Amino acid sequence: KELKKYDVHIIGLDLKEDVIRKCNGLAEKYGYEKLHFLSGDIAEYEGVQKVDMVVTLHACDKATDYALAKAVEWDAQVILSVPCCQHELNDQIQNKLLSPVLKYGLLKERMSALLTDGIRAELLESKGYSTQILEFIDMEHTPKNLLIRAVKTGRSRSGEALKEMTDAIHGHLTLEKLLYPDGFDAKEGV
């Protein structure tokens, strides 16, 4: 079957076997021969070399970072990511200037979640993507309603302001380490 008159091949990954069985059953039931679901971790997935679009939906915590890094590795033209459970930065963030606010756990958690997604978007920009952060569904349906939309432009941006900020809050994401294994050079994108 074509999807909106496009000949597409879709691969879905999830760690939950029951979800994979159900999704493959639905794909078969409705005749989508080019839609396959596999049980596996995106960080270890090697089934393809080139991908046009990567979509993530509530990939918990660092799984979003691994998916975004894979998307960059695959030179995906479009990335649509709905992150979830941004705990990594919450455990790291420290800043004397912000300490009066960061002492409140709820505020620290929310600030960390928003900063995490902003940092992810900026890291994608440093790798040649134009990014936007959008609210894709009303808050009454789910509080996890942010979408990072990234479109490949090939024009990398400097990460100097990002590096200055992440150093100031003592927070560095897994995505940064995956995209820049030798260390984030803020001027690399220029």
Model-derived features: where do they sit?
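Conserved beta-strand positions in the Rossmann-like core of class I SAM-dependent methyltransferases
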Residues: H9-I11
